[in-house]
Regions:
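Single conserved hydrophobic/aromatic residue that forms the stacking wall/gate
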Residues: 2-11, 15
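Catalytic cores of alpha/beta
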Residues: 16-25, 106-114
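Conserved, mostly hydrophobic/aromatic
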Residues: 26, 69, 103, 111, ...
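Glycine-rich phosphate-binding active-site loops on the catalytic face of alpha/beta enzymes
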Residues: 29-43, 120-134
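Conserved structured catalytic cores and adjacent interaction surfaces
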Residues: 43, 72-76, 104-110, 114
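Glycine- and Gly-Pro-enriched alpha-helical subdomains that act as flexible
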Residues: 44-67, 71-89
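Hydrophobic alpha-helical bundle architecture
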Residues: 82-112
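Beta-strand/loop-dominated core regions that host nucleotide or nucleotide-derived cofactor-binding catalytic loops
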Residues: 123-129, 134-157
C-alpha cells in the first residue's frame, strides 16, 4: 500500500518537512508501507527523501543510522572528526545503528537503542558498547575507531562495501 504525495513549487526544505510530517504520521499509524513522492526536484532527491521517511518510521531500513550528541564541555575528543570518520567507514552497513557520544554522563542513555556505541570516558580514552553493555574500556582514542570496526566484525554485522 504505497502512499502517493505530490508537492509542487516549494523549497526543498519545505518539501522535506511537509512530506515527512504528512506521510510519516500515516506510516506510523499503519496506513501504508511505501512512499511515492513527486516534486519539482530531481528523482534522486525524491528517492532519498522517500527512503529517509521510510527509515525514520521503521517501515523500511535501508541505511546505517547514527546517534550523536551535540558535544559539550565534557567531550574530550574531536566529536565531529570522529563522527565523520566512523560514518565514512561504516555508512554501507544497512540496518546498523551506531551511537557516538562525547562523554559517559549522558551518552549511554542517549544511545540506548544503538547496536554499537563509541563513548568518550576520559582524556584520550574511549569505551565501546554492544547494545547497552560496555564490552571494552579505556581504549586509546587513536585506535578506537578500528576497535569499533573490529567489534562490529566480531558480532557478524560487518559486510564489505561495494
Amino acid at each position: 500500500r504505497d502512499l502517493h504525495l505530490s508537492l509542487r513549487r516549494q523549497r526543498q526544505m519545505c518539501i522535506r518537512d511537509s512530506s515527512s510530517t504528512d506521510v510519516g504520521s500515516l506510516l506510523l499509524d499503519g496506513f501504508g508501507d511505501g512512499v511515492w513522492l513527486c516534486s519539482d526536484f530531481s528523482n534522486d532527491i525524491n528517492t532519498k527523501l522517500s527512503f529517509g521517511i521510510l527509515q525514520a518510521t521503521r517501515t523500511r531500513i535501508s541505511k546505517t543510522e547514527y546517534i550523536s550528541c551535540p558535544s559539550c564541555g565534557r567531550t574530550l575528543f574531536d566529536l565531529q572528526k570522529v563522527t565523520s570518520e566512523i560514518r565514512s567507514r561504516t555508512n554501507h552497513l544497512k540496518g546498523v545503528k551506531i551511537g557516538i557520544m562525547g562523554c559517559i554522563v549522558n551518552g549511554p542513555g542517549e544511545m540506548a537503542d544503538a547496536d554499537y556505541g563509541y563513548v568518550g570516558t576520559g582524556v584520550g580514552q574511549i569505551s565501546l558498547y554492544k547494545g547497552y553493555e560496555v564490552v571494552e574500556r579505556n581504549i586509546p582514542a587513536d585506535t578506537a575507531v578500528e576497535a569499533l570496526i573490529d567489534l562490529i566484525k566480531a558480532n557478524g554485522d560487518w559486510v564489505e562495501s561495494n
